[in-house]
A protein has these predicted regions:
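Helix-loop junctions and hydrophobic alpha-helical segments within the transmembrane domains
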Residues: 220, 227, 231, 305, ...
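Transmembrane alpha-helices and their membrane-interface boundaries in multi-pass membrane transporters
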Residues: 16, 279, 294-309, 340-359, ...
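C-terminal transmembrane helical bundles of large multi-pass transporters
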Residues: 168, 223, 227, 260, ...
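Solvent-exposed, membrane-proximal periplasmic/extracellular interface segments of envelope transport
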Residues: 1-27, 92-113, 128-134, 475-571, ...
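Extracytoplasmic/periplasmic
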Residues: 2-11, 15-19, 52-81, 103, ...
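Membrane-proximal extracytoplasmic
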Residues: 1-242, 252, 321, 366, ...
Length: 948
């Protein structure tokens, strides 16, 4: 990038200096802080601290310390004023003495330099030759000689005032209704946001000790808080899920030591997982740990332990005594061998179905790859433990008498299941027909669920985009922003409100002075008057409060969501309608019609058209005829006006390691006065030296013999209106209409919006519409999933065929997948959750889970038939014999997801669709396994009723 930038510099207009921004992503703003002073605090000279003083402390005390924090690539500053030394000439004195602003700037720059002149050697020593010429204070600047008139030196202080002054700033910061200085810590791309934010907060506390008494620096926004809340949610889900799994194991196994062995797989598998994550550089966060289910992790161990307990009981009954140690070892090996193949294949299938998730790319790939890696690591660890630790632990620790009969709970379940199984086998056709109807019905229902990319994460805080009419001054915007903050901070749920207005020092996020980003930081819910108040209700109250303040338009979103939307589509809203064409007026007219139509679509909020016009301008138009008469060119007029209004840097003043620009410009009162600008003296030196000035022109204006000419003789000054901004995309002009979506799924909203605009808005020839926003990622991911999901199903069937060596049996077990998916669809519909990528990942995971129980049952039925049992009896005994492992694996797998499905903590929104799909799917899959799968097996093998 730097190399390409150097190549195009020659094509960029003079005065523009392109620079690379921070090496960071759009989500790199992880930590913000404010510098403020107690109104009673005083400096050493007894004066109060000003905004310039606070900015100086930020630039030269705080910022250098924070930039040394590992992982920080930039500390961006907004607010206050950079200190400058202002030389403000009096135009009347300049005209009287024949000087221009450029003359003053050139004289100061020429008298403010240090020069090195090599070195000399004397007496064996080397002396560097140094010629100091820099000014040390304001007095020395004032004493710089501009020229001599009749032997009398003319100093800078003779024509100008020299004093400290503020910069012409392009941005400001406010907090709780008053101005502050704000710093933003930008994280280096690839760094860990939590680590960097914590290190920045610690360094900020150290920086506080180096500040004067009465000046405080406080954190305003720390992403660590959100990260910690989401990690706490994940940790709580995992702990609660583990406890539920362990309770179920105790209840259904009826053996304390067996349950402990199974439960021991959880920490061992987690150790395996965390080791792999550490080696792979994957951090523990909401996405990486969000799909971990301890129920799935112990499924393989459950199958092995349950079969060992059953075999131990049968062997004890046959022997009439407890088994010896050697007999127990032999029985463990035999029982494990009996089920190790289906259990390993089951875990292998669950693991394999996560592999196609790696085919996701873009934003969805970044989000879900860590999740897939973590689950694959956990299940791989579980398979290793099922092969090694579990059989060894059973053989060693399950000594003594093992209960031969089922516990009361399982006996009660068996009594209820036997008549249901008998009914299912008698009414096999009806059961299969009912399953088919359910699959078709849920397929139709899925098309009505709506869709979104991923559920919005409730960050806890609110970001508000406040916009005024183009041309609103920074001073006016600050006043309006103070009123907004004073109104918002009165809410008892609000902790503080701070804003960034306009563009900061490093223009990584440029905004005009009429626009502000407002961050509304909320108190913890426990401190709210009503902790159960819905977020949507509070958002409506905030919106109603600020709508009462005139002159503003608002967009409400969240801090991270705002940046994510910008990264995805270039706008901060959920949906962007981009209109492309040539003429700005036509674009604006059609854009307003689109906005009017979009506002009528249910779910639309904060609909607005990008402001492209209405920027007030003071235009100085050079008169080329007059310029030619004086032998001047437009560049000299442009240079004079630029120096007078914008200022010209004429060197720097050094105070220790601090340096401040010396700027030549008009006094503030004259800068604001067009009449004073018209009287600016423009130098005629170049024309006089060239000798090509038109004497008649000079005589007509009374400037014969003069060294300068007033600007009014060379140009006209007039107020006008120009475009506020001209945006292009792929080389074509475009205007954007944005909208947020409230209380509706994103996919359904965009679909209706497209239909409504296509029906009600006539787009002129040569103009066209494109749609942008986070739904683009939904479309991209959906297209990828349309390939990934069939591939997943093919992998499942291939593994089943490998396990059984029979297409029939593989098809029987595979039939569990569609019925499991129906349960997921019904669960989403019951909870009002739209389809999303999170739900899609849940369906992928469910495809693997759905075949596990069928694999175990069909394997047992096949072994019974191989043992000589007739088909009907083998099917019945196989279903009853595998009732406990089927229920156990289903219960532990689903209960492990229950905390994710019903938790309301930070980040639970992302986990909820995935968990809901898996729980609903496991319920329907279990019903299939216990009632429909025996029917399918008997029906497909009816022509081969003899033992296999």
């Amino acid at each position: 990038m730097a190399e390409r930038l150097q190549q195009v510099k020659s094509q960029i207009p003079t005065g523009l200096d392109p620079q690379l921004g921070p090496i960071a992503t759009g989500l790199g703003e992880i930590f913000m802080y404010t510098i403020d002073a107690d109104p009673k605090a005083r400096k050493a000279d007894g004066t109060p601290y000003t905004a310039t003083d606070l900015r100086t402390l930020q630039d030269w005390v705080i910022r250098p310390q924070l930039r040394n924090v590992p992982g920080v690539t930039e500390v961006n500053t907004i607010g206050g004023f950079q200190r400058q030394v202002h030389i403000t000439p009096d135009p009347a004195r300049l005209r009287a003495l024949g000087f221009t602003l450029e003359d003053v700037a050139e004289a100061v720059e020429a008298n403010n330099q240090n020069v090195g002149a090599g070195y000399i050697e004397r007496n064996g020593q080397q002396f560097l030759v140094r010629i100091p010429g820099q000014v040390a204070n304001l007095e020395e600047i004032g004493n710089i000689v501009l020229a001599r008139r009749e032997g009398v030196p003319i100093h800078v202080h003779d024509v100008a005032e020299v004093k400290d002054g503020p910069e012409l700033r392009s941005g400001a910061a406010t907090q709780n209704g008053h101005e502050v200085v704000m710093g933003t810590v930008v994280m280096l791309i690839g760094a860990n946001s939590r680590d960097v934010a914590q290190a920045a907060a610690a360094r900020l506390q150290q920086a506080q000790r180096s500040l004067p008494e009465g000046v405080t620096v406080t954190a305003s926004y720390d992403r660590t808080a959100l990260v910690d809340r989401t990690i706490a949610t994940v940790a709580r889900n995992l702990v609660e899920g583990a406890l539920l799994v362990i309770v179920v194991l105790f209840l259904l196994l009826g053996n304390f030591r067996a349950a402990l062995i199974t439960a021991a797989v959880i920490p061992l598998a987690m150790l395996f997982t965390l080791t792999g994550m550490a080696r792979g550089g994957i951090s523990a966060n909401l996405m990486s740990l969000g799909a971990l289910d301890f129920g799935l992790i112990v499924d393989g161990a459950v199958i092995i332990i349950e079969n060992c307990l059953r075999r131990f009981g049968e062997r004890q009954h046959a022997l009439g005594r407890d088994m010896t140690r050697q007999e127990r070892f032999q029985e463990t090996a035999s029982a494990t061998a009996e089920v190790i193949r289906p259990s390993l294949f089951g875990l292998g299938i669950i693991t394999a179905v996560y592999l196609p998730i790696f085919a996701l790319s873009g934003v969805e790939g970044k989000m879900f790859h860590p999740m897939a890696i973590t689950v694959v690591l956990a299940l791989t660890g579980a398979m290793v433990l099922a092969l090694t630790f579990v059989p060894a632990a059973i053989a060693l620790f399950l000594g003594g008498r093992v209960q031969e009969k089922e516990n009361r709970l399982m006996a009660w379940v068996r009594r209820r299941y036997e008549p249901l199984l008998a009914f299912s086998l008698r009414r096999g056709r009806w059961m299969v027909a009912g399953a088919l109807v359910l699959v078709v019905g849920c397929g139709l229902l899925a098309t009505r669920l709506g869709s979104e990319f991923v559920p919005n994460l409730d960050e806890g805080d609110v970001a508000m985009h406040a916009m005024r009419i183009p041309g609103t001054s920074l001073t006016q915007s600050i006043d309006m922003q103070k009123h907004i903050e004073n109104r918002l901070v009165q809410f008892p749920e609000v902790s503080k409100v701070f804003s960034k207005i306009g563009t900061p020092e490093v223009a990584s996020d440029p905004m005009p002075p009429s626009v502000a980003d407002t961050f509304i930081m909320m108190k913890p819910r426990k401190d709210w008057p009503d902790p159960r108040k819905p977020r949507a209700t509070l958002l409506g109250e905030l919106e109603a409060a600020v709508e009462q303040l005139p002159g503003n338009n608002y967009e409400f979103t969240q801090p991270i969501q705002m940046r994510t939307n910008e990264l995805i589509s270039g706008v901060r809203a959920d949906v962007a309608v981009m209109l492309f064409g040539d003429d700005l007026e036509t674009l604006l007219a059609v854009g307003r019609r689109i906005a009017a139509v979009a506002g009528k679509v249910p779910g639309a909020a904060d609909v607005r058209v990008e402001e492209t016009s209405g920027l007030p301008l003071l235009t100085v138009t050079p008169d080329r005829t007059a310029l030619a008469g004086y032998g001047l060119n437009p560049g000299q007029v442009q240079s004079t006006v630029a120096t007078a209004v914008g200022g010209q840097v004429a060197g720097q003043l050094f105070e220790g390691d601090r340096r401040f620009d010396i700027v030549v410009r008009l006094p503030e009162a004259l800068r604001q006065d067009p009449a004073a600008l018209a009287d600016l003296p423009v130098s005629l030196e170049s024309a006089l030296s060239g000798g090509d000035a038109d004497e008649s022109s000079r005589a007509a204006s009374g400037t014969n013999g003069a060294r300068t000419v007033p600007l009014r003789e060379l140009a006209t000054l007039a107020n006008s209106e120009g475009p506020n901004q001209i945006n292009r995309e792929n080389g074509k002009r475009r205007i954007v209409i944005t909208a947020n979506v409230r209380d509706r799924d994103l996919g359904g909203f965009v679909g209706e919006l497209q239909q409504t605009i296509g029906r009600e808005v006539q787009v002129p020839n040569g103009y066209w519409i494109e749609y942008g926003g986070s739904f683009e990622q939904l479309i991209s991911a959906s297209r990828r999933l349309a390939i990934v999901v069939p591939l997943t199903l093919v992998i499942i069937f291939a593994l089943l065929f490998w396990a059984f060596g029979s297409i029939k049996d593989a098809a029987i077990v595979f039939s569990g997948v569609p019925l499991a998916l129906t349960g997921g669809v019904l669960a989403l519909a019951a909870r009002g959750i739209p389809l999303s990528i999170s739900a899609g990942v849940g369906f992928i995971a469910l495809s693997g889970v759905a075949v596990l129980n069928g694999l175990v049952m069909i394997s047992f039925v096949r072994s019974l038939r191989e043992g000589g049992l007739p088909l009907a009896q083998a099917v019945r005994d196989g279903a009853l014999g595998r009732l406990r492992p089927v229920l156990m694996t289903a219960l532990v797998a689903s209960l492990g997801f229950v905390p994710m499905a019903f938790n309301v903590g930070a980040g639970s929104e992302v986990q909820r669709p995935l968990a809901t799909v898996v729980i609903g799917g496991i319920v329907s899959s279990t019903l299939l396994t216990l009632l429909v799968l025996p029917v399918l097996y008997r029906w497909l093998h009816r022509r081969d009723a003899s033992p296999a």
